[in-house]
């Protein structure tokens, strides 16, 4: 092989290797910043079509309804823990260390974004509450499908009295 061909071959191999390295780093960065949406049932039982469950340490978004009576606040800090459930019976505990949105209430729909812990709790970095009684985030509405039922607070209050 003459020196000119050898130089071209070395340059081509280096160029292909560089492009492959850049592509793999780009895919790794995109994958680590990807936030997948799950319902509480999908976290507990896995996705319905694939059976895939999120791994501990994975960054995810969870949408569902805040379970009535599940909210526990720490009186000395902003730490709050509550459960989120869906119509299929799945439930996950969420911890949050910041101010909750003004519209956050038990029995309301929310979307929480954070990291799934080894213990199955979601350490939320962001909690979004729905706007009014008719609004539901698109991901939550799609995931809950036709099984979502609006809570009737008047019946709950009369039963409690």
From Swiss-Prot:
Biological process (GO), any one: cytochrome complex assembly
InterPro entries to which the protein is assigned, alphabetical: CcmE, CcmE-like_sf, NA-bd_OB-fold
Membrane topology: Single-pass type II membrane protein
GO CC term, one of those recorded: plasma membrane
Similarity comment text for this entry: Belongs to the CcmE/CycJ family.
Summary of the function given for this chain in its UniProt record: Heme chaperone required for the biogenesis of c-type cytochromes. Transiently binds heme delivered by CcmC and transfers the heme to apo-cytochromes in a process facilitated by CcmF and CcmH.
NCBIfam families reported for this sequence: PRK13165.1 (NF009638), PRK13254.1-3 (NF009729)
Source organism (scientific name): Shewanella sp. (strain ANA-3)
Main location as per UniProt: membrane
Keyword Membrane applies: yes
Pfam families listed in its UniProt record: CcmE
Alphabetically ordered keywords of this record: Cell inner membrane, Cell membrane, Cytochrome c-type biogenesis, Heme, Iron, Membrane, Metal-binding, Signal-anchor, Transmembrane, Transmembrane helix
Sequence ranges on the Cytoplasmic membrane side: 1-8
Gene Ontology molecular functions: heme binding; metal ion binding
Gene responsible for this protein: ccmE
Periplasmic side: 30-161
Keyword match Iron: yes
Binding-site residues, heme: 131, 135
Transmembrane residue ranges: 9-29
Subcellular location: Cell inner membrane
Region described as Disordered: 138-161
Annotated protein name in UniProt: Cytochrome c-type biogenesis protein CcmE
């Amino acid at each position: 092989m003459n020196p000119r061909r050898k130089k071209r071959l070395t340059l081509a191999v280096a160029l292909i290797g560089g492009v492959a390295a850049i592509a793999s780093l780009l895919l790794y960065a995109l994958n680590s910043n990807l936030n997948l949406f799950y319902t509480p049932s999908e976290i507990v039982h896995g996705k319905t079509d694939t059976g895939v469950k999120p791994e501990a340490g994975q960054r995810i978004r969870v949408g569902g309804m805040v379970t009535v009576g599940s909210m526990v606040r720490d009186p000395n800090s902003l730490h709050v823990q509550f459960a989120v459930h869906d119509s299929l019976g799945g439930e996950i505990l969420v911890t949050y260390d910041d101010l909750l949105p003004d519209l956050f209430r038990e029995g309301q729909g929310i979307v929480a974004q954070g990291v799934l812990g080894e213990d199955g709790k979601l350490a939320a970095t962001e909690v979004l509450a729905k706007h009014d009684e008719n609004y539901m985030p698109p991901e939550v509405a799609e995931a809950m499908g036709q099984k979502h039922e609006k809570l009737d607070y008047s019946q709950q209050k009369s039963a409690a009295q």
